[in-house]
Amino acid sequence: MLILGASLPSQVNTNWQTYIMIAIYFIILLIIGYYGYKQATGNLSEYMLGGRSIGPYITALSAGASDMSGWMIMGLPGSVYSTGLSAIWITIGLTLGAYVNYLVVAPRLRVYTEVAGDAITLPDFFKNRLNDKENIIKIISGLIIVVFFTLYTHSGFVSGGKLFESAFGLNYHFGLILVAVIVIAYTFFGGYLAVSITDFFQGVIMLIAMVMVPIVAMLQLNGWDTFSRVAEMKPTNMDLFRGTTFLGIVSLFAWGLGYFGQPHIIVRFMSIKSQKMLPKARRLGISWMTVGLLGAVGVGLTGIAFIPDNHIKMDDPETLFIIMSQILFHPLVGGFLLAAILAAIMSTISSQLLVTSSSLTEDFYKLIRGEERVKTHQKEFVLVGRLSVLVVAIVAIAIAWSPNDTILNLVGNAWAGFGASFSPLVLFSLYWKKLTRAGAISGMVAGALVVIIWIAWIKPLASINEIFGMYEIIPGFIISVIVTYVVSLLTQHPGDFVERDIEKVKSIVREK
């Protein structure tokens, strides 16, 4: 999660050339949105999932861009700058989590969502997988998505508004509205196809930025000797283990557990044209992620030497990338690099808007209007999907209008909330035949509650014992797994169709 608040130092200047680059970037996004709109046929599955026709390259980079958000460009460099190389453990945990997600979840989820009634949302898949005729699990999981993603989306709008405030000295609300209008436009009209293509485009920009800035900074300093100097400035800067503990490392690693339950990421697997394309997507996606994260660490480490060398007073470490990009490069290039920050922020906003819209349309409106109506009134449901994008965005903007630190801190824990409530359920749904509806609901609710309780009442006790300060996804995930397993063994199995479906899924996944 990216929170920008500090103004930039006086050494950082922006001019008309920077504005031109930002304007070009916005125009390209709108053109892609228009392309997505022209390609649309009025089919709900196409609007929400691209008609399951997305290729491996767009799948890989759009998944990465929507996942990393402004955290990779702003948050991680700031963390490395503040704490040194020990911050790298979270990047290792995330990379391993993403790799396992591609390997274990992606193939089966792509096939199973189609086998199980051609589900286009995660709650719809849970409902079909567990034969939930009362739609209880669909409603509960849909509510979790709508509530938490609305808050998640608002944090993205706050980041966009504060970027314009910090980098350009513009009014926060002007920046907020500008970012919102562009994102809403291409998401509203272009749907999933436009969101995926823009995320691909934005993923390319982010990667270029994360390669350029640390390399140029290192060349301006002392080449490879920069890292020796960083270590001399403070020994813990280049030490993987100093400044952290075993439990701290485990907590950072545990971020990887969240991948299996993030709706805006795993929906990319559901939309790919064929599960046979997933190995190619995995290779590209993990390569993109590895290079990008290493670049972010490089920005943080070189920044430790760069900031004092240039006599810069930096109040907020999260502005490190902005400062370095504007001092090191020509305004045109600096504008491109600022566009990379916007790309990171907007790619996540658009993905979350669309997932929330999908849930409102597929998991709630469809229940009200009836399953049969979808077949004969596709355009009505596409219109509802578009209006849902607008409604969610307006609510998120309203919350973001007066940023509240308490809300932003809550949003920062949403990854753990989704990870603890959805990750075990996704894995059990794909691999365990004995999973029951009661087990799924109990485990999902238990995981979410443990995360909330841990954040509200247990984490404040960290000063008493370090174990209370562990990342909340760890106890949430463990409790969710135990509850799901035990309750499923004690309740009625959904039926023989589950075994048939899982065997069919396994057979299709094995096809080369």
Curated annotation (Swiss-Prot):
Membrane association type: Multi-pass membrane protein
Domain of life: Bacteria
Swiss-Prot/TrEMBL catalytic activity: L-proline(in) + Na(+)(in) = L-proline(out) + Na(+)(out)
Transmembrane stretches, start-end: 16-36, 54-74, 85-105, 139-159, 174-194, 200-220, 246-266, 288-308, 327-347, 381-401, 410-430, 438-458, 467-487
GO molecular function terms attached to this record: L-proline transmembrane transporter activity; proline:sodium symporter activity; sodium ion binding
Subcellular location: Cell membrane
GO biological process, one term: proline transport
Coiled-coil regions listed in the entry: none
Keywords: Amino-acid transport, Cell membrane, Ion transport, Membrane, Sodium, Sodium transport, Symport, Transmembrane, Transmembrane helix, Transport
Function: Catalyzes the sodium-dependent uptake of extracellular L-proline.
PANTHER family: SODIUM/PROLINE SYMPORTER-RELATED (PTHR48086), SODIUM_PROLINE SYMPORTER (PTHR48086:SF3)
Family: Belongs to the sodium:solute symporter (SSF) (TC 2.A.21) family.
Protein name: Sodium/proline symporter
Gene from which the chain derives: putP
